[in-house]
Amino acid sequence: MGKIIGIDLGTTNSCLAIMDGKTAKVIENAEGHRTTPSVVAYTDSGEILVGQAAKRQAVTNPDNTFFAIKRLIGRKYDDKAVQEDIKKKVPYAVIKADNGDAWVATKEGKKMAPPQVSAEVLRKMKKTAEDYLGEPVTEAVITVPAYFNDSQRQATKDAGKIAGLEVKRIINEPTAAALAYGVDSKKGEQTVAVYDLGGGTFDISIIEIADVDGDNQIEVLSTNGDTFLGGEDFDLALMNYLIDEFKKEQGIDLHNDKLALQRVREAAEKAKVELSSAQQTDVNLPYITADATGPKHLNIKVTRAKFESLVSDLVMRSLEPCKKALEDAGLSKSDITEVLLVGGQTRMPLVQEKVKEFFGKEPRKDVNPDEAVAVGAAIQGGVLSGDVKDILLLDVTPLSLGIETMGGVMTKLIERNTTIPTKKSQVFSTAEDNQPAVTIHVLQGEREMASANKSLGRFDLADIPPAPRGMPQIEVTFDIDANGILNVSAKDKATGKEQNIVIKSSSGLSEEDIEKMVQDAEANAEADKKFHDLVTARNTADNLIHSSRKAIQELGDKVTAAEKEKIEEACKELEAATKGDDKQAIEAKTKALEEAFAPIAQKAYAEQAQAAVAQGGAKAEEPKKEEDVVDADFEDVEDDKK
């Protein structure tokens, strides 16, 4: 059985870890970095760039560079949160798919589901793991924000499938961080608050770590959060400030200039990072735009105090879920023994200060906020494969689950923060006399009104025997697996007839859609390999042409005119082949040049060998002239007179 890798699929950055013996190890990507930007770009030449390479060209290719896709995954286009993101001027197109989901589109009009784009990031992670391990990788544990709903979890699993990974478990990010901390911690029973402020999402989980019969038991008591609050919002606040200041100075609004907007976005992110350690920074963007009077430059000084005033409401927004999580766990702030900070945005001093004020204790600084989640995912992978023993993980469902009942009310079957896996049943009946069928409308959320909650799916239980209203007994069962993914069944107790629904297409993608995307991905991988092989063949050919011509020049008169002509002809034919896309033709002409040059190389080598032998013979005679030379040991003697 191969390794089960751990992947933190982040909004801004992603991270990969594997179990190396008894410890989890973060693996560097091909560029030598421990995290990979969650950015995917589609170039004019048809190449797909992922990570740093995609991020680097974002300014010149804003329409086809996709970032923060995690904020769209498993969401409907008409969701208020999605509409707000579109208003925030993401440079790429967000469109409404036929099924109502939020998809993205390239400037050429190619439509893609968010799981399809995220799969490119996962594929890079998979390749990194395979390069490190030297063996195929087919299984993974992938993390999601604790507050992700069923659709978002399923869409994440779909992304894994498209990337060629069997997702063995979906695990909540704060839980993974606690797992990473809990495995290293040997302090007995602890109640830990995991404050996870990442690039696009915020989670707070209250977790109990205890030693139960020698096992390290990690139990989630409660979780809460906001799936539209993260570092991207902090960047946006600073970006809008810079654009507003520039407009005041120059009278030009950069909001409608995609290239300028992308430059300001990147500068805002860089300034935000600098202000975590410096009191002020200069944002300097020369030639940001131009008008009739000439080019314009953006040069604005930003102090830490100014930046904190711009984002203080975002930081305060994160504290409300903290209160709710404590209430749901039935605990007070004084019951918390440790506070863990996870996610890159927690490096901001204001965030650390407000978390310290809220919980009344200093947050721990020994947990790497960028890597802890991936490490926890790798440990969970180790647990599932049997490589890691003595760990018991008890997670919870973040949102209540139920069905719509008479009057448009949501009746909850499973309350939020219920430990999973779990199974609950409840008996319902008909609303009218002789009702032949009932529609089971499955909902997720906390509102009383059914329409205000997230609809996960509908199905009908038909052929109910005629009976007065309230008489038939319809047993509805909700079954949540360890990934937090739901199965619902309805059974007529009188007839035994049963109907069920696995809420597996709530991501909006059918099995056929996913299979097509898997095939597209495989085709792309094949195309990428062909492109790579073609470039390798061209490079080999170019090197051979260069070395052949150089050798002919150096050998000079030792090569006949006929030989020179033959080599030059072969070089020209190979040059012509490298301008085309036929790898086999390039390789054939490369072989022809090698064969043409081989006799010359052999002749040159033989002449060099003869010269070396002759020179060696002369040198061998030289020592005979100095037969009176005596070998002696020398001893260094310090000169005291120095």
Swiss-Prot record:
**What SUPFAM superfamilies does the record point to?**
Actin-like ATPase domain, Heat shock protein 70kD (HSP70), C-terminal subdomain, Heat shock protein 70kD (HSP70), peptide-binding domain
Give the Acidic residues compositional bias ranges.
628-642
Q: Name one GO molecular function term.
A: ATP binding
Give the induction note.
By stress conditions e.g. heat shock.
Chain intervals for the UniProt region annotation (Disordered)? 614-642
Task: Keyword check for Chaperone, yes or no.
Answer: yes
Q: Does the keyword Chaperone apply?
A: yes
Which UniProt keywords are given for this protein, alphabetically ordered? ATP-binding, Chaperone, Nucleotide-binding, Phosphoprotein, Stress response
The protein's matches in CDD domains, at most eight in alphabetical order, are given as: ASKHA_NBD_HSP70_DnaK-like
Which residues are modified to Phosphothreonine?
Answer: T201
Which family would the database say this protein is a member of? Belongs to the heat shock protein 70 family.
Which NCBIfam families does the entry mention? PRK00290.1 (NF001413), PRK05183.1 (NF003520), prok_dnaK (TIGR02350)
PANTHER family attached to this UniProt entry: HEAT SHOCK PROTEIN 70KDA
Q: What does this protein do?
A: Acts as a chaperone.
| Name of the protein in question | Chaperone protein DnaK
The root-end lineage is: Bacteria, Pseudomonadati, Pseudomonadota, Gammaproteobacteria, Thiotrichales
Q: Which gene encodes it?
A: dnaK
